[in-house]
Amino acid sequence: MAIHDIGKAALAVILARTVFSQVPYIGAVAGVASVLGHIFPFYLKFKGGKGFASYFGMTLALNWKLALVIAVLVFAVTLITDYIVLGTTLTVFSVPAYLGIAEHSMLLALILCIATVVIIYKHRMNYVRIYHGTEIGLRSVMKGKHRMK
């Protein structure tokens, strides 16, 4: 369930920042670890989700204002293109770039890019289906023409 995925990543960031407050970028490291743990859970033979909800939770805890912006961005891109994956893609590229610039830290951007690369990889088949015209759009799902897996 997405709300749990958002919450666990946000909690990881908050706890890490609280317990290890003197360690630079510990929140980002904990957030990325949470995203990777969601994508590759050992108890599910390393076959988990695609990681965006956890990524959003991480972003929410790192910078809640940015999280609000990306929520609107994902919604807008999805409405315009009919594909959630395109909003997801724009977001996972935008967050490291924005936070790296805002915090004046290439290291922060690189830490966040670890999750970006893995999320993009996990969505690779969505991109292939969009290219071939076989990806099911959100409007089709909402109209009941297709069921999401």
Language model regions located:
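Interhelical loop and helix-boundary elements at the membrane-water interface
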Residues: 1-10, 40-53, 80-89, 122-149
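Alpha-helical transmembrane segments and their immediate juxtamembrane flanks
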Residues: 105-129
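Interfacial segments of multi-pass membrane proteins
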Residues: 16-20, 33, 37, 52-81, ...
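Anion-binding (especially nucleotide phosphate/pyrophosphate-binding) glycine-rich loop
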Residues: 8-32
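Membrane-helix boundary elements
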Residues: 28-46
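Alpha-helical transmembrane segments of multi-pass membrane proteins
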Residues: 1, 34-38, 74-78, 115-122
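Alpha-helical transmembrane segments and immediately membrane-proximal extracytoplasmic
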Residues: 1-3, 18-27, 64, 97-110, ...
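Hydrophobic alpha-helical transmembrane segments
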Residues: 27-32, 56, 67-72, 86-90, ...
